[in-house]
Regions:
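PAPS-dependent sulfation machinery
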Residues: 83
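Patatin-like phospholipase
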Residues: 1-80, 112-122, 166-177
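Active-site gating loop/helix substructures
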Residues: 86-184
Length: 185
């Protein structure tokens, strides 16, 4: 989808992303012309192990020590450091916002300044799966909890037009798991 937009001359004035959309958005904001191509080569190479290392049962054992999450976000942090050249929002080519959710207020939080890595980790911190991220005195979780499609934020930033990308294949749905190990996978 991103490559098709690029090929048709659609270039964003700003990018706002939530969760995996924040990761994709950061790639595009860092490199508006090459980011889509880079993503098209990276995503197909990922497996469950890329971001969720270890067995399902090892993850359950993690709960005995962490109490709040199954997987540390170390692999994701390493991925961000390795593949996204910018360290801060200010280094990006296109204005970018990563959406997160404030644990205390349960409201969406627009992250658009300072450290990019912590913002991306916060925006992708799926509760129970990854740890929350502390940033600017707030504890933050995945932005998809309250702003999966951050249209309000785009309108607040005076976006004249919006392009929303739904990355789910039409009519395609994973089967429901039929065991605890299936849930953990």
């Amino acid at each position: 989808m991103l490559q098709a937009l690029n090929e048709h001359g659609v270039t964003p004035d700003m990018i706002i992303g939530t969760s995996a959309g924040a990761l994709n958005g950061a790639f595009l904001a860092a490199d508006p012309f090459g980011g889509a191509n880079q993503l098209s080569h990276l995503w197909p190479g990922f497996s469950r192990e890329t971001f969720f290392p270890g067995s399902a049962w090892k993850s359950v054992r993690t709960l005995r020590t962490s109490k709040t999450y199954l997987f540390p976000n170390d692999e994701l942090s390493e991925f961000i450091n390795k593949h996204i050249p910018a360290n801060t929002f200010e280094e990006l080519e296109v204005p970018f916002v990563a959406m997160a959710t404030d644990v205390d207020t349960r409201l969406s939080v627009a992250l658009d300044t300072g450290d990019l890595r912590s913002a991306l980790l916060a925006s992708t911190a799926i509760p129970v799966i990854f740890p929350p991220v502390e940033r600017d005195g707030r504890l933050l979780y995945d932005g998809g909890l309250v702003a999966n499609l951050p249209i309000r934020q785009a309108l607040k930033m005076n976006a004249a037009s919006l392009v929303l990308l739904d990355c789910n294949a039409p009519g395609q749905r994973d089967p429901y798991p039929d065991s605890m190990s299936g849930v953990l996978e």
